[in-house]
UniProtKB/Swiss-Prot annotation:
GO terms for molecular function: heme binding. It comes from the Eukaryota. Pfam families: SOUL. The gene is HEBP1. Forms a distorted beta-barrel structure, with two helices that are packed against the outer surface of the barrel. Porphyrins are expected to bind to a hydrophobic patch on the outer surface of the beta-barrel structure. Belongs to the HEBP family. This is Heme-binding protein 1.
Length: 189
């Protein structure tokens, strides 16, 4: 627990590497097309709970893992964003299922420590191209759904992207009150 607190308060945060391919603005919404690197990720899946509750539960498990709850007892340092896979229902609301990802820090990419919590899996993910929009505040389900709808409208019918899921991303620790960064990502097809 101490490692988790130290990680969130004192560590520098390593950001998931990406390259901006293009920028756009439409319908009063700014967005970017980015190429994100692949790599090793710690993943927790939670089902049967509302989005906000499931996301918080999974994120706490991942924070404990990078804080030292692993076979090496290694405090790995925090990475950003915490990336939540959301699965939209037909009406645009979110299903009661999330997969929360945290990219393993670069120095542990080659050989990630094994999680002590069996619900955490280590997955290799390929790089991907995304459409991204950013917003501030303490993001909840309603905010992510709202910005996903805005991004969908801004992209229009010209852009091809996955419709069966999207990513809800938070970059900041809970104790940061101002200047928060949240993003919605659609994966380009």
């Amino acid at each position: 627990m101490l490692g988790m607190i130290k990680n969130s308060l004192l560590s520098t945060v390593e950001t998931w590497p990406y390259r901006v391919l293009s920028k756009g603005e439409k319908e009063q919404l700014s967005y970017e097309e980015r190429e994100c690197e692949g790599g090793q990720f710690a993943v927790v899946e939670v089902t049967g709970k509302p989005f906000d509750e499931a996301s918080k539960e999974a994120a706490l498990k991942l924070l404990k893992y990078v804080g030292g709850s692993n076979d090496k007892g290694a405090g790995m340092g925090m990475t950003a964003p915490v990336s939540i896979t959301a699965f939209p229902a037909e009406d645009g609301s979110l299903q009661q299922k999330v997969k929360v990802y945290l990219r393993i820090p670069n120095q542990f990419q080659a050989s990630p420590p094994c999680p002590s919590d069996e619900s955490i899996k280590i997955e290799e993910r390929q790089g991907m191209t995304i459409y991204s929009t950013q917003f501030g505040g303490y993001a909840k389900e309603v905010d992510y759904v709202n910005y996903a709808a805005k991004l969908k409208t801004a992209l229009g019918s010209e852009a091809a992207y996955r419709k069966d899921f999207y990513f809800c991303n938070g970059y900041d620790p809970p104790m940061k009150p101002y200047g928060r960064r949240n993003e919605v990502w659609f994966v380009k097809e």
